[in-house]
C-alpha cells in the first residue's frame, strides 16, 4: 500500500468514524473465537471449489450491505412482514446468502453467539479475494448486526449497473469514498458474473436510441448479442464480468476497459467518460497490478468501516436471516 494512501485511509477512519470505529480490532475474537478465520476459510475454500463465483457473491453482499446504513448485516435479513433489502432492485440476482448461512452454522457450532453476520461478510470477502489469487489484508472485527433493514436506502444508495459516472460519484462521496475508491472497488468486477438484464440495454437500444452503446467494442458487442439475443428469454443467462480471466482476481478488468470491453455501463463509464479523472486511474491499474492491489486493500478497509454498529448497539444474530 502506498504511504499516502495508507495515511489517507487512517485519517479517513479517524475523521469519519471516530469513537465507534475505535472499537473495531483485528484481535476482537482472539479469546472468544480464536479460530474464526480458519473456520470461515474452511467453508469458503469448500464453496469456492464447487462455485467459482463464491468470492464474488460474498464481496457484492459486503459492498451492498455497507452502502446502506453501514456494515451491519442488514442485507441478510429475510422479510418479517416488512420489505427487506433483499427485495430491492439493486439486489436482484444477489447470491451467496447460503454461503453466509453455512459459515454462520460452522461458527455457531464452535463459538455460539459470538461472531456477527456483519463481521462474517467482511472476513469472507477478504478470504474470497485471496482464494481467487488476489491480495490479503487485515480485517478488523467488532461489528454488531442490525435489528432492521432499509429497502428505500438500498434503492437510493447502491449504484445500479445503468448509472452514469456523474451519478455514481456522489453515491461514493456520500459514504466518504473518493474517486480512487470508486475505481479500485469497481475492480472487484475482475471476477464474478452478471445477468443479461444488467447490460443488455447496451446491446440494442442504449438510452432509447435504437442503437447499441457506441462505447462497446464491435467484436465484444457481437459476442454479447449472441449470449443475450434481443427478445430472447435471457432472465437466467449469465456471462463473465471479466472476459479474459473470469475467475482470477487480477488487473485484467482494467485492460478490458481500455479495449472497450467493460460489461456493465458502470464499468465502461470509468474509462469512456470524456475528461474524467477516473481514466488516469484505470490506466494506472491496467499498467500495475501491484498498484491496483494496494489501492484495493486500502479501499476495502475504508468500505468495511462505514458506520459500524459497535458496543451496546445492535446484536449478534444467531441466524443471519432473522433477528434474535
UniProtKB/Swiss-Prot annotation:
It catalyses: 2 a phenolic donor + H2O2 = 2 a phenolic radical donor + 2 H2O. It is found in: Secreted. The record marks 60 as: Transition state stabilizer. Its cofactor is Ca(2+); heme b. SUPFAM superfamilies: Heme-dependent peroxidases. Substrate binds at residue 159. Heme b binds at residue 189. The active site is at residue 64. GO terms for cellular component: extracellular region. It is an enzyme of class 1 (oxidoreductase). Ca(2+) 1 binds at residues 65, 68, 70, 72, 74. Glycans are attached at residues 35, 150, 207. Its EC number is 1.11.1.7. One of its GO terms (molecular function) is lactoperoxidase activity. Residues 1-22 form the signal peptide. The modification Pyrrolidone carboxylic acid is found at residue 23. This is Lignin-forming anionic peroxidase. It comes from Nicotiana tabacum (Common tobacco).
